């Protein structure tokens, strides 16, 4: 991979082999630093991953960040009814960042104060039958612009 300028990274997911906080931490502990992490805020939150702990301990391994939010009421239904991942997505588990229950301060702090140079991918896994995709994309873009402009301003103030 090095020869081609590529880096291997693991993308954790709900209802997959590495899901919960202790599983993600064990995976990262048992693999070398040559294996990066695609940190997904929605999957992390829904699986009980502590974003502050993961970014503090393994921030140097984060190569890519996916930003999406979680609807608390749907997460509760998913857990109560033991819904599959596909059923959870169809039920509207994920939403545009800033419209759910995730506290993004550990991620915005990590991005502002670390040397992270990777991509931020804003996701809005919406059912297009329930919401016009362009409306979700517009809200997601505004959220990212507002959130990370504030994060950048905080970094400049601290220096």
Predicted segment positions?
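Electropositive, glycine- and tryptophan-enriched low-complexity nucleic-acid-binding patches
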Residues: 1
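Basic- and aromatic-lined ligand-binding clefts that recognize polyanionic substrates
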Residues: 4-32
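Histidine-acidic metal/acid-base catalytic patches
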Residues: 21-35, 39, 45-159
């Amino acid at each position: 991979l090095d020869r081609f300028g590529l880096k291997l990274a693991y993308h954790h997911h709900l209802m997959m082999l590495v899901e919960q906080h202790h599983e993600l931490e064990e995976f990262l502990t048992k693999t070398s630093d040559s294996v990066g992490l695609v940190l997904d805020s929605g999957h992390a939150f829904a699986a009980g991953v502590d974003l502050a702990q993961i970014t503090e301990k393994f921030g140097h391994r984060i190569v890519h960040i996916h930003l999406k939010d979680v609807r608390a009421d749907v997460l509760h239904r998913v857990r109560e009814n033991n819904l599959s991942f596909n059923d959870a997505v169809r039920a509207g588990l994920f939403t545009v960042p800033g419209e759910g229950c995730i506290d993004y301060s550990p991620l915005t702090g990590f991005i502002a104060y670390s040397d992270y140079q990777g991509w931020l991918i804003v996701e809005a896994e919406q059912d297009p039958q329930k919401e016009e995709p362009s409306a979700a994309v517009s809200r997601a873009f505004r959220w990212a612009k507002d959130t990370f402009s504030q994060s950048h301003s905080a970094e400049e103030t601290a220096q």
